[in-house]
Amino acid sequence: DLRLKGTGTEKLAEELSQLFPKARVGRFDQQSMRKRDDFQKILMAFERGEIDVLVGTQLLAKGIDIENIGLVVVPDSDMLLHIPDFRSHERAFQQLQQLAGRIGRRAERGVMMIQTYQPEHEVLKALKTGDYKGLMETEMEQREVFGYPPFTKLLKIDVKHLDAQVATEASRWLADQLRKQLGNLVLGPQV
């Protein structure tokens, strides 16, 4: 029974260690890989069977070939599905597909469990059925309706200053100036 109780690999590793006291739990994240060779040490320990459960961030999905993965669990996938970016569904599908590709590569078939409050979400349905083409057709239709790339071009301007108030005022002034020329095509500022 997976319930959202906190965030981060450290918290998840602690919970798993308590639930499965005999399991050797390892972490694969920035905090556990402080030295350059820690990356390889952790992966080698997992492949040698010195780590039973490896808790990691998105780094694990990125083209790393690890043998003997029988189960991948994605907690709180809703966060991944609802990033405020027009590409979030495409990116979520890609990341979840990469993770799915990590399991059951050489031995027996693996299992992927995804925690979600929206099991009927279009990204999860496409992942389950393998219908990437259908997902992208829907995405392209939505992008056209809402005026997102590739149907328009977006430009993001970051305004930075050591004094947050100065940055806020400057970004509002800039947005006002741009609106005079471009009208409602200007979104923001987001402060």
Task: Annotate the PLM regions.
Residues 1-172, 176-180, 184-185:
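Inter-lobe coupling/hinge segments of SF2-like helicase ATPases
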Residues 188-191:
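Short, intrinsically disordered low-complexity segments
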